[in-house]
């Protein structure tokens, strides 16, 4: 089972790392740099027995996402039978709540 503290610490670390990419263009290099920036932290979790997968590529950053000035980053964390998904979306400045709500 994944403890709430592990999830909260991971979310906090993601926030810190992602903040360095706020004004970067969503391209292959930026997505790779983001993934690589997370590796040291995620490696520690792997050493503790967690399975980790990062997704930040063209599969979740389509042309539409890029055209909307967004960047999607997802971390899957698994231990035993417990699997969690942490979604991070960087959006353009000035976005309204109405734009974020599903139609």
PLM segments and residue spans:
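Structured, hydrophobic secondary-structure cores that serve as assembly/anchoring elements
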Residues: 1-103
């Amino acid at each position: 089972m994944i403890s709430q503290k592990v999830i909260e610490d991971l979310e906090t670390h993601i926030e810190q790392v992602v903040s360095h990419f706020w004004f970067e263009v969503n391209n292959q290099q930026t997505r790779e740099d983001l993934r690589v920036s997370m590796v040291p932290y995620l490696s520690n979790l792997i050493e503790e027995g967690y399975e980790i997968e990062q997704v930040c590529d063209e599969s979740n950053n389509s042309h539409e996402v890029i055209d909307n000035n967004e960047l999607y980053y997802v971390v899957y964390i698994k231990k035993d039978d417990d699997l969690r998904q942490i979604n991070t979306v960087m959006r353009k400045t000035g976005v309204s709540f109405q734009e974020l709500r599903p139609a």
